[in-house]
């Protein structure tokens, strides 16, 4: 994709360029390490919150509910969708992939439950917010890129294309437009609604403070931690994160693949702002990196925290009924799962 002409970049684009200058000198653009220098990371996921009673069809069209159907693909009306945050520990780093959210007005609007502050959800893992060194957001939507300012020492990794996408969304002609049958004030199907003021403020706050790396495509941010672009698989600058672990390589997908069941069965999911071809290419990228679908970590899989999503079967209940799962442990790492 060609970069936009300077005259069209706008205020946000200029900030992004300034941020790149600020961080590039200090942090560079990634590096390569020898195989014996690549650690195996410990990995957990925590549930930032849970969207309750979501109609299955709009989330995954191939699973649309058909009244009276005996087909297991079409006899489920609603599902609960977790908002999963990846926690990665190893080497000199503690990394979060996505950060959940805390916009209380959206909490009410979406009918979400089991939300808890991220610092409380990290506590059972023995991690404090100030210990976190890197934040990789799969994309900049409110339920994935909130709470950034809770991590004062962490550097944010965001794609330049995502910043351009945010700028475009905020210049959308009618950002609050909604369908006739949408609830009053509801605007969740329009581009701008993915980027409410608090989220945008926190993303660009990191940039302005010199605590961000603006990524152009692929980048190895630490030994065994590799960002892969998945542009337009959900938003303009979606990105995946490859993680080296004792159970093989994992790839976190955020909403580039919201559902593990979808990537397993090759179905689109969460498609309101998605280029479906690019979503399938994101699926393919995870298959290529991991060798299959088992190690693809999805953001909103309804089967999360159960044996039906094997990656998350070692789970327990955390603050306010949220859930945590232990996915992989590095050599010498103690389990955090309560006995």
Please provide the spans of the model-predicted regions.
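Short, electropositive alpha-helical surface patch
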Residues: 148, 155-158, 306-328
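Bacterial N-terminal signal peptides
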Residues: 13-28
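Short glycine-enriched, charge-decorated loop/helix-capping segments at active-site entrances
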Residues: 109-112, 173, 266-272
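Metallo-beta-lactamase
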Residues: 32-127, 131-134, 161-229, 247-255, ...
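N-terminal secretory signal peptides that target proteins for export/translocation
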Residues: 1-13
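Active-site metal-binding motif and surrounding structural segment of the metallo-beta-lactamase
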Residues: 112-158
């Amino acid at each position: 994709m060609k970069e936009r002409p300077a005259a069209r970049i706008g205020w946000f684009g200029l900030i992004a360029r300034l941020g790149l200058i600020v961080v590039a000198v200090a942090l560079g653009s990634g590096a390569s390490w020898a195989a014996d220098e690549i650690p195996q990371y410990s990995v957990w996921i925590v549930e930032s919150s849970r969207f309750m009673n979501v109609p299955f069809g709009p989330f995954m069209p191939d699973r649309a509910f058909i009244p009276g159907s005996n087909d297991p693909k079409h006899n489920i009306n609603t599902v609960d969708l977790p908002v999963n945050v990846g926690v990665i520990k190893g080497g000199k780093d503690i990394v979060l992939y996505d950060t959940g959210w805390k916009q209380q007005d959206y909490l009410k609007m979406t009918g979400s439950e089991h939300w808890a502050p991220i610092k409380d959800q990290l506590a059972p893992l023995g991690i404090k917010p100030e210990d976190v060194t890197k934040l990789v957001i799969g994309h900049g939507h409110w339920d994935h890129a909130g709470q950034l300012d809770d991590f004062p020492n962490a550097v944010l990794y965001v794609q330049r294309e995502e910043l351009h996408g945010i700028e475009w969304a905020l210049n959308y002609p009618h950002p609050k437009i909604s369908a006739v049958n949408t609830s009053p004030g509801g605007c969740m199907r329009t581009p701008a609604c993915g980027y409410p003021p608090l989220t945008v403020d926190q993303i660009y706050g990191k940039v302005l403070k010199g605590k961000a790396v603006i990524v152009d495509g692929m980048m190895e941010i630490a030994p065994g931690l590799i960002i892969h672009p998945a542009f337009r698989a959900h938003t303009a600058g979606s990105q995946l994160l490859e993680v080296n672990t004792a159970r093989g390589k994992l790839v976190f997908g955020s909403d580039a693949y919201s559902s593990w069941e979808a990537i397993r069965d090759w179905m689109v999911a969460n498609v309101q702002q998605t280029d479906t071809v690019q979503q399938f290419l994101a699926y393919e990228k995870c298959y290529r990196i991991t060798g299959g679908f088992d190690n693809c970590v999805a953001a909103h899989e309804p089967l999360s925290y159960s044996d039906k999503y094997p990656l998350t079967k070692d789970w327990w209940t955390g603050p306010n009924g949220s859930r945590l799962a232990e996915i992989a442990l590095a050599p010498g790492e103690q389990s955090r799962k309560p006995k």
